[in-house]
């Protein structure tokens, strides 16, 4: 049986977070009717929520931010639902299954960005912005150039993420459900468009909340059954896992999947700052009523995600013990059926039988839908709010802006389906690494410095932001993943897998240098306006009305 090549998570954690990208050849599985029935129940229920939400979406604020009426707890669950992808579940547990302790290190890597969001970004972002993070970046800077840069940064991240999600969705569904790849991609695209088109942020939020609850329940049940098997003793769990794993005691120590310190540092910075620059995550902070609820959102989201990653660690060791040692889950060559990414799915069957296997498969599909819905809404708002209403057609009515947003949703949906089909047999795992690098090198520096550095000017933000974005793209192309593995050259021009360390440095240095040397009258005026922005960012004065651009 052909192996499913794991997502980049099998060796590199960027994809474990977000790609859901199972790249390579997939042998279609028999149709899993339990999974299909459970998934249909989920779809019918969420379409009902979309219909309910569509009756409550009456304005631009309702469509983009659910009217700002989501509570901190609900938003925390939704953020967790937006951030915990199917490959977080499958990829991290697969990494633990193959490498043990390394999987825990990487799962913690996905959490380190959240304290930055909590302490540095959440409160000021909510007090200064209205619908998108470009509202914050352009608060005292020149609207046109900054919004174009922010929208481009957002759209590139969204596009790369969407392609990775769509290809991963098709491969995953082909594997779990036995459905044809093209049918799976079209199904995800159509459902994604329906959620966002009719229900906006309100429907997207509730799809993400439901998915988060289902995923946390499923993972909790699996972890509980694993611990029950070993008498609720971690000592027994680790001892039994070491006894059956080919690496033996080596799974309890770091194995050095990232070989050199530069790559490790670059990877860590990309994960940490990339999270704080993802447009679909930042957009969620505008769905709550005030800065206090925004802080609570991050607090709850971090708690849910931390709990989830602890569960994946237990699930990974449970898979070593109950799946790795069971010949029923191996093919003729002795490899795991479906590849290592399927370790958690096989464990679901081992601890809960066919019915629970169907449930976990349906949850994996629901997870992809929740993530792509959030991405699509972020992309649509960048086009309609940042570009159309504030650059190309200033003074556009709410109705016109919403019309453009919905057209963008349709266009993004169709493009995502087409690219999902075209990239079926391509290695798309690098796209998520590139998305994170761009978010960390373009979006994050501009957001952070616009809120904290009084001497920032439009010239500095523009030149530094574009330099960061282009450096990330160029270094990724010249690196080992694209230059050698995809383009087929013998040796990479840029030797490191991850460009974040270098591209983030270029962005911050560029922003600092071009702002510090900007002696124009406009630059001086922008510096003087920082005090008013600072007061607004601290007090939230005027936040209910938002800033009229």
UniProtKB/Swiss-Prot annotation:
One annotated GO molecular function: symporter activity
What cellular component terms from Gene Ontology apply here? plasma membrane
Q: Which GO terms describe its biological process?
A: plasma membrane acetate transport; sodium ion transport
Q: Which InterPro entries match?
A: Cation/Ac_symporter_ActP, Na/Glc_symporter_sf, Na/solute_symporter, Na/solute_symporter_CS, Sodium:Solute_Symporter
Q: Which UniProt keywords apply?
A: Cell inner membrane, Cell membrane, Ion transport, Membrane, Sodium, Sodium transport, Symport, Transmembrane, Transmembrane helix, Transport
> Which family does the record claim for this protein?
Belongs to the sodium:solute symporter (SSF) (TC 2.A.21) family.
What role does this protein play? Transports acetate.
- This protein is called Cation/acetate symporter ActP
The organism is Salmonella typhimurium (strain LT2 / SGSC1412 / ATCC 700720)
């Amino acid at each position: 049986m052909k192996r499913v090549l794991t997502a980049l998570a099998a060796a590199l954690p960027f994809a474990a977070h977000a790609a859901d990208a199972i790249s390579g050849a997939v042998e279609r599985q028999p149709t899993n009717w339990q999974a299909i029935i459970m998934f249909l129940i989920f779809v019918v229920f969420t379409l009902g929520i979309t219909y309910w939400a569509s009756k409550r979406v009456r304005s631009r604020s309702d469509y983009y931010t659910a009217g700002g009426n989501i509570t901190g707890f609900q938003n925390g669950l939704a953020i967790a639902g937006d951030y915990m992808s199917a490959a977080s579940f499958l990829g991290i547990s697969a990494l633990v299954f193959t490498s043990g302790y390394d999987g825990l290190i990487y799962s913690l890597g996905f959490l380190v960005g959240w304290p930055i969001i909590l302490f540095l970004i959440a409160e000021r972002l909510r007090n200064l912005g209205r619908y998108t993070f470009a509202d914050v970046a352009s608060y005292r800077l020149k609207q046109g150039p900054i919004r174009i840069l922010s929208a481009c940064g957002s759209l590139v991240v969204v596009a790369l993420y969407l392609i990775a999600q769509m290809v991963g969705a098709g491969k995953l569904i082909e594997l779990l459900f036995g459905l044809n790849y093209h049918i799976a991609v079209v199904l995800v695209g159509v459902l994604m468009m329906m959620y966002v088109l009719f229900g906006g942020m309100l429907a997207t939020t509730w799809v993400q909340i439901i998915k988060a609850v289902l995923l946390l329940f499923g993972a909790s049940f699996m972890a509980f059954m694993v611990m029950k098997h070993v008498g609720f003793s971690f000592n027994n769990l680790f001892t039994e896992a070491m006894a059956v794993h080919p690496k033996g005691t080596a799974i309890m120590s770091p194995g050095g999947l990232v070989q050199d310190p530069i790559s490790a540092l670059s990877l860590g910075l990309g994960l940490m700052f990339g999270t704080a620059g993802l447009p679909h995550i930042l957009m969620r902070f505008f769905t709550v009523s005030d800065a206090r609820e925004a802080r609570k959102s991050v607090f709850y989201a971090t708690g849910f995600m931390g709990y989830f990653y602890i569960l994946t660690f237990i699930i990974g060791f449970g898979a070593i013990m109950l799946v790795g040692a069971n010949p029923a889950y191996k093919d003729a060559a002795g490899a795991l059926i479906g590849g290592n990414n399927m370790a958690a799915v096989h464990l679901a069957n081992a601890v809960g039988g066919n019915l629970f296997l169907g449930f976990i498969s349906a949850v994996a599909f629901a997870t992809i839908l929740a993530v792509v819905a959030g991405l699509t809404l972020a992309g649509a708002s960048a086009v309609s709010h940042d570009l159309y209403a504030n650059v190309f057609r200033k003074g556009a009515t709410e109705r016109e802006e919403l019309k453009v947003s919905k057209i963008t949703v349709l266009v993004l949906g169709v493009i995502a389906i087409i690219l999902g089909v075209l990239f079926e047999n391509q290695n798309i795992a690098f796209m998520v690494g590139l998305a994170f690098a761009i978010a960390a090198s373009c979006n994050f520096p501009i957001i952070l410095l616009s809120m904290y550095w009084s001497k920032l000017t439009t010239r500095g933000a523009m030149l530094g932001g574009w330099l960061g974005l282009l450096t990330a793209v160029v270094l990724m192309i010249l690196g080992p993943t694209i230059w050698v593995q995809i383009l087929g050259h013998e040796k990479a021009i840029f030797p490191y897998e991850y460009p974040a360390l270098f591209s983030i440095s270029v962005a911050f240095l560029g922003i600092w240098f071009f702002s510090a040397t900007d002696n124009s009258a406009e630059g001086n005026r922008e510096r003087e306006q920082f005090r008013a922005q600072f007061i607004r960012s601290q007090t939230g004065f005027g936040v209910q009305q938002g800033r009229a651009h």
